[in-house]
């Protein structure tokens, strides 16, 4: 059995297979997922698993170099947005250089088709979606 926080086999494989600048999306329960993109559906019920818990576990194993968010997230769901930014800031304090980019929600939905996978959570907070660009550890 794995010893680290990320126990889900599909997610663990996804993170291990990422190359530099590959993207993954972590989304709320309502974001449309392109048919051609791998879907890792974790949603059990409203709020389970939570978006921020899923992000926290993925960041425990994934090196990131970029973060893409819908600009609407900041205004509509400021508390969850702030919690996400705090996690990104912790990654920066650990020495990571991370670019934060805001785009429209429509552009965000289109951009998800570039992701290697979309991870669907049970989150029901509006605009609780993020695209992470993979970094390297060297």
Curated annotation (Swiss-Prot):
One of its GO terms (molecular function) is D-ribose pyranase activity. Its EC number is 5.4.99.62. Pathway: Carbohydrate metabolism; D-ribose degradation; D-ribose 5-phosphate from beta-D-ribopyranose: step 1/2. It is found in: Cytoplasm. Belongs to the RbsD / FucU family. RbsD subfamily. Homodecamer. This is D-ribose pyranase. The gene is rbsD.
